[in-house]
Amino acid sequence: MPRLFTAIEIPESIRRKIACLDLPAADVARITAPEDLHITLHFIGEVSVSLCDAAQVRLRSVITPAFEQKLRSAGVFANRGRPEILWVGVDPSAELLTLRDAIGDVLTSLEIKLDTREFNPHVTVARLKRPAPSVAAEFKQRNSPWYSGFTARSFSLYSVAPGGQDPHYRVVEEYSLRAL
């Protein structure tokens, strides 16, 4: 059964900028491969092949315009107070939220249950291998302020590669947004 999510791919020019961030050493953090950098819109999870096929087709009905997407500052997600995820923030623009809502409407029409937690758009750049508050604080301090941006011209339905292969994510289908 495929494990799916929808996301906006990060363009190569922005990947290069993210690669220049002051990231922790490999013994402390697992750095996200550049080709895996993305902004998750909806995590779908494991679904049947038939539901994957239906989602792939129905997502073609999402029609929203391309938009300018801003990235801003570095941050950390913690679990029970322990830092785990290092990220670059994504401006929750009206256009991004409109796209996310349109995708969500399609997915819920297929009876796919979506995450109900507050949407906090970001690009995961690394995962700490063990809790390291000083490493997380240093990451934020060394990489803030940080700003960039790009034109979001499409979104994709992704599947997660089995067994930790690189890249970890495979585009099932890419969906173009309307030209600006």
Provide a role label for each language-model segment:
Residues M1-L180:
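Histidine-dependent nucleotide/RNA phosphoesterase domain, centered on the 2H-phosphoesterase fold
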